[in-house]
Amino acid sequence: KAQQQETSLLSKSALIGKLLNKAQMLSQIIASQSGLSRDSQGDLRQLSELITSVTPQVTQTLGEGRAMGAYSLGQGFLNSSSSTRFDELLQQLEKLQAEYGLKLQDALGASKAAHAALDSLASTSNASLKQGSELFEEQVVMAETLDAPWQDFYDGVSRLMAQTYQLD
C-alpha cells in the first residue's frame, strides 16, 4: 500500500526493492523450514540455494537497471548520479554473470536429471545478464538521445527477467 501511495518514481523503486528483499527472505525461510536447505541430497541443497539466493540477485540487478533506465528515458536525460549508478550496475552485471554461470554449473552438474530438465532454461537465464547489460548500454548509457519510449525499455527488461523466473 505504501508503494501505491508514493508519488516519486525513485521512492517507489526503493520501496519495491525492500519488498523484494523481504520476499527473498521469506523464500529462504520456507526452504529452511521445509528442510530443503538441509536435505541429505547435495543436489537438492544446491538447487534450493540457487532458487532462494542466487536467481533473486539476477532479477533484482536487472530490475534496478529497468527502474533507472525507465526513469531516465521518462525524464529524457541521464543525470550524473544515475550515470554513475549505471556504471556501477554494469560492472555488477559483469561480475554477476561470471559468478552466476559458475553457480549454475555447480547446481546443474550435481544431478543428471536437473541438468537434463533445466540446462536450456539456465543458459537462457544466464544469457539474460549479458543481454541486459547490452540493452542498458545501448538504450540508456551510450544513447545519443533518451527519446525512446520508456515503456518499451521496461517491457524489454521485464522479458529478460522472465527468463530467470522461468528457471525458478
Predicted regions mapped to residue ranges:
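Hydrophobic alpha-helical segments
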Residues: K1-D168
